[in-house]
Regions:
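N-terminal capping/linker segments that flank leucine-rich repeat
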Residues: 1-53, 263-326
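Tandem repeat scaffolds
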Residues: 13, 17-266
Length: 326
């Protein structure tokens, strides 16, 4: 089993800490792992259960502020990265069940590796390529794969994030190709200026933003398409926002409550028809149309939007919107 005590114990028993330190040193230095007391599993070096040492936080600083006649004291401290890799090649590694919190990757390559069930909370990467790698059921909460460094973003190709914890994941300006997000926890995740090509989503999407607009033209990012994206397995769009996204090559669930709106003119016409109405259904419908209008056809985005009628509180508002938009 991935979390079996034996996987961790071998790094803690006689010679284990020294072996672990040497493995990490070689990986950081770009040296091969040949000659170490390591086995291979399906062609990958067996590093299952590897645990990077936890850094100690600096002594907390404190500051006191006055507000409204009351005094508030805040304490804060910096937590260092657990491991930092510069231009390293992490290739053919089996790191299932590893403990690697707050990993930092600059200009690295990860290829043909397994991080299934690994604890990688707070991962950060810049100008890094990840390919043919699995993070199945890994804990990547509060991580970021959206850093901009050395004039480029991160590129992820053929990566498996199924059932992974990706909550509060930073994805800005990253490129995702053939990536599987099925049943991953994506709460509070923003695909900001991210490219999604041949990707799959399934399960509940909650508080996710897909932003296809070009918001930083000075970076020459090019288009941020959603192409051949499979969302047929999504069971709920809970507070999910699509901004400037084209649905021409997005496969949505076959559900009558999902309505793709094409053209801001249709939204404008709907708002005009609601101008003289003040009932509850009209108010909710108007608010939804005003929100859609903000992100349609502006800043390089597509002139399309998506409404999930199930998310409206008033059933009459859903009926009204359907009449106005279809």
């Amino acid at each position: 089993m991935l979390n079996d005590e034996a996987l961790v114990e071998r790094w803690l028993g006689p010679g284990g800490p020294e072996l672990q330190a040497e493995v990490i040193r070689r990986l950081r230095a770009g040296e091969r792992l040949d000659g170490l007391a390591l086995d291979r599993i399906d062609g990958r070096w067996d590093l299952r259960g590897l645990g990077a040492p936890e850094p100690r936080a600096a002594e907390p600083d404190s500051t006191t502020r006055q507000s409204g006649g009351m005094s508030f004291t805040f304490e804060f401290s910096d937590v260092a990265a657990t491991l930092e890799f510069q231009r390293a090649r992490l290739v053919d590694l089996d790191l299932r069940g590893a403990h690697l919190p707050r990993l930092r990757l600059f200009g690295c390559v990860i290829d043909n590796s397994l991080f299934d069930g690994a604890h990688c909370v707070g991962l950060r990467m810049w100008a890094t390529d990840v390919s043919d790698t699995s993070f199945l059921a890994a804990d990547l909460a509060r991580s970021s794969v959206g850093g901009w460094y050395a004039g480029r973003g991160n590129r992820l190709r053929k990566v498996d994030f199924r059932h992974a914890d990706l909550s509060r994941l930073g994805c800005g300006v990253a490129s995702f190709t053939d990536v599987d997000f099925a049943h991953a926890q994506l709460e509070c995740t923003n695909f900001w200026q991210a490219s999604l090509v041949r990707c799959r989503f399934a399960g509940v999407l909650r508080e996710v933003v897909f932003d296809g607009r070009v918001l930083e033209p000075e970076r020459d990012l090019g288009p941020n398409p959603m192409q051949d994206v499979d969302m047929r397995g999504v069971t709920a769009f809970d507070d999910v926002d699509f901004r400037g996204v084209s649905f021409d090559r997005v496969t949505l669930p076959d559900h009558p409550a999902l309505v793709v709106v094409r053209g801001v003119a249709r939204v404008e016409a709907g708002l005009q028809r609601l101008a003289d109405r003040d009932d509850h259904a009209a108010q909710e419908a108007r608010g939804r149309l005003q929100h859609l209008r903000k992100f349609m056809g502006v800043a390089g985005g597509a002139d399309q939007a998506l409404i999930d009628m199930r998310t409206l509180i008033d059933p009459e508002a859903a009926l009204l919107l359907r009449v106005l938009l279809t």
